[in-house]
């Protein structure tokens, strides 16, 4: 069994690691000291596309699975653990809410609204 990341996973891990080291790490101590939210880190995650890591590709996201999410989150934590923790809450919601809702019968208008909310509209 090959446990190495796939080429796509490695590319996403590298992208996250670069952000973590170059952008998040230099700001982390200030956020810890001031007990402030790392807003700049989220702007960087958005610009890199990683904020949409677990959003389905059909909605413009990267469509990552749980394993890929874990690999990326680990790299984010190298730069700022607080960013990784809050990113966890954001990204895992995208993974959890999709599959959970797929098996539930909903009126068409409710399902449509759910899908809009899922992609942030």
Regions found by a protein language model. Give the residues of each.
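N-terminal capping segment at the start of a domain
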Residues: 19-29
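Intrinsic disorder at enzyme termini
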Residues: 1-8
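Glycine-rich flavin
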Residues: 36-47, 51-121
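Generic N-terminal segment detector
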Residues: 11-17
